[in-house]
Each structure stands twice: as structure tokens, then as C-alpha cells.
């Protein structure tokens, strides 16, 4: 994480020479091969480098959202990069709040089939939005259009009714 933040800082300085209003938002996603990466990232951010403008978090995160917000200095806003595409082996598996997908469907349809989950993603958005300053939802194409529509609508209108988003 120290080398990662160092490179982000160097790149940020160079970038701002040509684009003074550009911002640097490194990702807090943890590489699987570095178990203590999250702790090192927090340690680097404790130094409050001015070249860093905010943090992004998403799948493979080092910390749960509430813990990340507690540990990252308040100077840095957090933007969310949620995975609204995948059904299994992902950030929010289909059984996020209940075990409701039959094994045959999970095994047969797998990770990337069409599976609109507007009510579930509305609930996830409500649970996470207090920790972040917005989001850019992860999408892999047409299998998640409904989820993307609902999530994006809630970024702008947090209290919108799901039915209104879908209409």
C-alpha cells in the first residue's frame, strides 16, 4: 500500500500540472495476495497526503463500509463502486438478506445471468449511502440494466420509490 499511495501521489502531482482540477481517488480494494494491505493503506492515509482527494471502495474491500469510514481520515470522502451485476461469488450474492435462490439456479445460471433485484439493491443503497459521497456502479453490460437503473436513480433521488424508478 505504501508503494501504491506513493505512485498515486506522484501521478497526482504530474496530472495536476496539466489538469489542475483533476482529482486522485485511489481504490481501497485489497489485493488477495497481500492480507495486511488494508492496514497499510490506512497507515498511509493517516499521514494526510494532499495529493489524495478521496478513496474508492468496492468488491474485494479491505474493510466493511462502516469500518472504512471510521478509519479513513475525515479529510477523504469515500465513493462507492458496488457490484450490482453478479449473482454468486460476489459482493452481494442473491441471498444477501435471505436464502432464496435454489441451488440448481445458482449452479446452472451462475454468476452473470439476468437477475433483476430492484428491491434488494434499493435496500443495499439505503444501508451504504450514509458512508459515501456517491457511487459509480459496476456493470458488465445488459444483464443488470434494471439494477443499474434503480441504483443510479437512488444516487440522485435517495428516497425514490422503486416503482417510480422502474417506470
Specify the residue positions occupied by each region the protein language model found:
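Catalytic-core regions of glycoside hydrolase
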Residues: 1-167
Amino acid at each position: 500500500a505504501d508503494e501504491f499511495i506513493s505512485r498515486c501521489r506522484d501521478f497526482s502531482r504530474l496530472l495536476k500540472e496539466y489538469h489542475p482540477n483533476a482529482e486522485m481517488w485511489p481504490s481501497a480494494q485489497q489485493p488477495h495476495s497481500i492480507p495486511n494491505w488494508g492496514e497499510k493503506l490506512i497507515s498511509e492515509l493517516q499521514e494526510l497526503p494532499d495529493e489524495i482527494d478521496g478513496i474508492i471502495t468496492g468488491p474485494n474491500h479491505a474493510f466493511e463500509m462502516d469500518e472504512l469510514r471510521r478509519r479513513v481520515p475525515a479529510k477523504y470522502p469515500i465513493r462507492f463502486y458496488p457490484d450490482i451485476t453478479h449473482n454468486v461469488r460476489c459482493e452481494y450474492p442473491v441471498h444477501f438478506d435471505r436464502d432464496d435462490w435454489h441451488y440448481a439456479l445458482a449452479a446452472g445460471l451462475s454468476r452473470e445471468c439476468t437477475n433483476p433485484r430492484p428491491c434488494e439493491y434499493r435496500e443495499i443503497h439505503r444501508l451504504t449511502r450514509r458512508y459515501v459521497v456517491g457511487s459509480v456502479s459496476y456493470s458488465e453490460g445488459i444483464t443488470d440494466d434494471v439494477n443499474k437503473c434503480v441504483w443510479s436513480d437512488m444516487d440522485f433521488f435517495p428516497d425514490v420509490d422503486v416503482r417510480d424508478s422502474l417506470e
